[in-house]
């Protein structure tokens, strides 16, 4: 099954891929906010295609809308008017454009802290 974290990773990858060719050298983007609706189960081996569209640009802030659909064999048997049945997930991703070196330098200065285990995890 396609888990929600993997669906989010695919969505972020689509946003990054659409943005990267437009960034100046030395610049990158970092995620700041995500809204994700996981709408449909996707069996192992299902082909998923994610489309991302820039919907807002405000200074360094970019907001993308994305939709993840079943394609290929996992979409077989659905008529064109059944598009909603093929949607595995949809949502939005907000990213901020940053200078890569400055961002990494600031991150390296932050003290690292252990991440606490969630309750019930041995």
Show which residues each predicted segment covers.
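Generic structural detector for well-ordered beta-strands
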Residues: 1, 37, 92-96
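Hot-dog-fold acyl-thioester-processing enzymes
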Residues: 1-25, 102-122
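Residues that recognize and position ribonucleotide moieties
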Residues: 9, 28, 86
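Generic structural signal for well-ordered secondary structure
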Residues: 12, 27-32, 59-62
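Hydrophobic beta-strand-centered segment that forms part of the acyl-chain substrate-binding groove
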Residues: 16-49
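HotDog/MaoC-like acyl-thioester-processing domains
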Residues: 43-44, 55-122
């Amino acid at each position: 099954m396609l888990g929600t974290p993997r669906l989010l990773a695919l969505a972020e990858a689509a946003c990054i891929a659409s943005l990267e060719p437009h960034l100046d050298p030395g610049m990158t983007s970092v995620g700041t906010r995500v809204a994700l609706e996981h709408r449909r189960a996707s069996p192992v081996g299902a082909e998923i295609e994610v489309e991302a569209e820039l919907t807002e640009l405000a200074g360094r802030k970019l907001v993308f809308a994305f939709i993840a659909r079943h394609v290929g064999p996992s979409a077989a048997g659905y008529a064109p008017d059944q598009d909603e049945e093929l949607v595995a997930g949809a949502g939005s991703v907000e990213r901020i454009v940053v200078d890569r070196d400055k961002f990494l330098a600031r991150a390296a200065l932050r003290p690292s802290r252990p991440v606490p285990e969630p309750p019930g995890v041995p």
